[in-house]
Amino acid sequence: MALDDRRTLYVCDARIGDIRKFDDFGTLLGTIGRKGSGPGEFDRPVEVEVRGDRVFVRDLGRSRMFVFDLEGKLVSSTPVDEREGRWRKFRALPDGRFVVEMETAGETRLELFSAGFSRQKTLYRKAVPRSRIAVGPLREDIPLPFVPVVEWDVTPEGLIVAGYSGDYSLEILDPDKGRVAAWTRSFKPFEVADKDRKDYLAGPGRDLPAEAVRTLVFPKTKPAFEKLVVNGRGRIWTFLPSADPKERTVFEAFDADGAFRSRVILEDEWPRTAPVVFFVGGVWMAVAGPDGETSIVRYQITN
């Protein structure tokens, strides 16, 4: 999901194959693109970003980056070059450049790209254990359980916050000046219990072949945090794992300069994998219901 300067919400629907526009009250304003193989048509759109008067859509199925104006007119289409690593995520900076998460065997990198999607330099790199396996006849990509990963987000001012959940190390990066802050927070890891193993194997999309289940190795402990986001005021939130999945959601909040602010317990559940997009004073979230249907919900964030 993404927001433009008028707080119009853009929702990327990979299954239907379009981008849906909503106003601040959730009224459908229109769509961008459609399923197909022609100019400006999608196979499997997986990410959307908006900067200024341009909408950027990454299509995984066609391996292309599409650029539209705010009304949905196609401006350009560029192939996604994955020869130097697999694209996992991209975010637009306020000045029109992009940060792309690229993954190779044993390493995650954050690369800076120009407004025209040409690679400029590496902003961050981290050696990481293998986090996914390919299973089934279609070699479907399945995340491995409780493996430390790199999580990152972009502040409203255009700084990049990157963290490694293996050791709770965090960095704030300026795309031009480099690292401006770095720190490591101490933590006591939770053990991976038998219930965690059973819940993982019973999760959606985890109908693994018997051979994959037998060879799957679970780590002894959980990573330091499960998700990192930057809210609409530039504060950093790291969502912590728990010993019991039924416990309420807990995150730690840091100021924009990295100073620890507080530990917060939420009254409502916050799905760890839910796509979110922040604005000042609130957040839009894609929440999956028990019937498998996804709802787009707006929440107010209070002090």
Per-region residue spans from a language model:
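Eukaryotic scaffold repeat domains enriched in small/polar residues
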Residues: 1-303
